[in-house]
Regions:
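A short linear-motif detector with a strong N-terminal bias
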Residues: 14-16, 44-47, 103, 151, ...
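A small/polar active-site loop signature that marks catalytic segments
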Residues: 4-16, 26-30, 69-209
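Periplasmic/cell-envelope proteins involved in peptidoglycan metabolism and beta-lactam response
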Residues: 1-70
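A generic structural signal for short, non-catalytic loop/turn and secondary-structure boundary residues
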Residues: 28-30, 59-61, 166, 236, ...
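C-terminal soluble interaction/assembly domains
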Residues: 175-176, 181-257
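Intrinsically disordered, low-complexity segments enriched in polar/charged residues with Gly/Pro
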Residues: 52-53, 159, 245-246
Length: 257
């Protein structure tokens, strides 16, 4: 027997807790469930210009449309499938990962709505998650009606920045995370972007990045938390709780904006 993670009580599905655990269930005859993944929402992974092979997968993983938060593997879709198969086994089903297959006209049995866009952006900024940044870069292209290629993602991002009045002279956007050595931003373009983000009256759709806790707060949250060695010394403590900024860290490069 096993204890399921959820159960039905008084007509409602509730979580199993220590105080009110769901009743044990004795599984019936073993049933095998084949798990396939369809990650065709993005093209097969390639590297953009300036993206060093040594970065994969520990700095940033190959960009696929499926993955698990915090998982740095060469095949994030396979990792997601394995995770789901394991979850099925915890519910008494013999889930086995069978690789990729197009969903085609398969019947939809269930669906799940993940984090909202603002939640994804907040998470990406707080922990400096390169993988989420790259997925958002691809999704920007799709939102503009383009195929999710590197070139189209760059094109879509440049279109949006131009609409926001951000100067793009002497800038280069090769990747969404900034990992590419060919990414270039000027002080003018960066400060203009930050001004737009902080201007909630004229750009309410961007306000959550600054006012909604998106950008880390000095000495308080995310990659600027004092436990990470940020703003915890006598010369810097004065900015704790007052400054919002974004870190940028590679093997030999450290930035703060």
């Amino acid at each position: 027997p096993y204890r399921p993670a959820t159960c039905i009580r008084k007509g409602k599905r509730v979580n199993s807790t220590k105080k009110k655990p769901c009743p044990l269930v004795r599984p019936g005859p073993s049933r095998t469930v084949k798990v396939f993944v369809d990650d065709s929402y993005y093209p097969s992974p390639t590297r953009p210009s300036g993206w060093r092979s040594g970065y994969e997968p520990y700095v940033v993983r190959p960009v696929r449309s499926l993955g698990i938060d915090g998982s740095y593997t060469n095949d994030s879709s396979a990792g997601a499938a394995a995770y789901f198969a394991t979850a099925l086994r915890s519910h008494g089903l013999n889930g086995t990962n069978k690789g990729r297959r197009s969903a085609g006209t398969a019947e939809e049995l269930s669906s799940y709505q993940g984090a909202t866009l603002s939640e994804q952006v907040k998470y990406m900024l707080q922990v400096s998650e390169n993988n989420v940044a790259e997925m958002l870069f691809r999704n920007t292209a799709i939102a503009r009606g383009y195929q999710a290629t590197w070139a189209n993602s760059t094109k879509a991002a440049q279109e949006i920045l131009t609409e926001l009045g951000v100067p793009l002279t002497n800038t280069s956007l090769a990747s969404g995370s900034g990992v590419s050595r060919n990414d270039r931003l000027t002080a003018n373009s960066l400060t203009t972007m930050l001004q737009r983000v902080a201007n909630s009256a004229d750009y309410p759709e961007l306000s959550s990045i600054y006012y909604g806790g998106g950008m880390p707060l000095a000495g308080r949250s995310g990659t600027l938390n004092y436990t990470a060695g940020r703003f915890n010394t006598s010369p810097t403590r004065c900015a704790a709780g007052k400054l919002r900024a974004k870190t940028g860290t590679l093997f030999d490069t450290v930035g703060l904006s």
